[in-house]
Every structure is written in structure tokens, then in C-alpha cells.
């Protein structure tokens, strides 16, 4: 079992982090990185969705 400590609002706001886009891309203050294992899976899923819908997948309407 892991131990956790509760952070105060002041401590939480002092944390600097980046943004995760949900597709394997994570960007910090000065750079971005790609988790290719996740990204390739998303590329495959998007390709299959576009093929199955004739290019009319949800984000291409």
C-alpha cells in the first residue's frame, strides 16, 4: 500500500507541470515528448475509424 500526504492549496499551486493531450503527447514549459506506444495505437484507431466511415469520423465532419 502506498502512503500519501495531503497538500495544502499553496503547495498544490506551487507545482509546475505540463499538459497531457490524451494521445501520447505531453508538453511541458519548454518542450513536448511523445509516448510512441500510445500514439501509434491512436493513429491506428483513427485510421480504422476514417476507413470505416469513408473519412467522416467524428472529428472530420
UniProtKB/Swiss-Prot annotation:
Q: Record's Gene Ontology CC terms?
A: extracellular region
Pfam families xrefs = Bacteriocin_II (PF01721)
Entry keywords, A to Z = Antibiotic, Antimicrobial, Bacteriocin, Disulfide bond, Secreted
Record-linked InterPro entries = Bacteriocin_IIa (IPR002633), Bacteriocin_IIa_CS (IPR023384), Bacteriocin_IIa_dom_sf (IPR023388)
- Provide the residue ranges of the propeptide in this protein: 1-18
Location in the cell = Secreted
Q: Please name every pair of cysteines joined by a disulfide bond in this record.
A: 27-32
Q: Write down the superkingdom of origin.
A: Bacteria
- The reply on keyword Secreted is yes
| Keyword Transport found | no
Q: Could you tell me the Gene Ontology terms of the biological process aspect for this record?
A: defense response to bacterium; killing of cells of another organism
Q: What is its main location?
A: secreted
Report the Gene3D superfamilies cross-referenced here.
1.20.5.130
Q: Tell me, what does this protein do in biology?
A: Bactericidal activity; inhibits closely related Lactobacilli, Listeria monocytogenes and ivanovvi, Enterococcus faecalis, Carnobacterium sp and Brocothrix thermosphacta.
Q: Could you say which protein family the record assigns here? A: Belongs to the bacteriocin class IIA/YGNGV family.
Query: What is the protein name stated in its UniProt record?
Result: Bacteriocin sakacin-P
Q: Which organism is it from?
A: Latilactobacillus sakei
Amino acid at each position: 500500500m502506498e502512503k500519501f500526504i495531503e497538500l495544502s492549496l499553496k503547495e498544490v499551486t506551487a507545482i509546475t507541470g505540463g499538459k497531457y493531450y490524451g494521445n501520447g503527447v505531453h508538453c511541458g514549459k519548454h518542450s513536448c515528448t511523445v509516448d510512441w506506444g500510445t500514439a501509434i495505437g491512436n493513429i491506428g484507431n483513427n485510421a480504422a475509424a476514417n476507413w470505416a466511415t469513408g473519412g467522416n469520423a467524428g472529428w472530420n465532419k
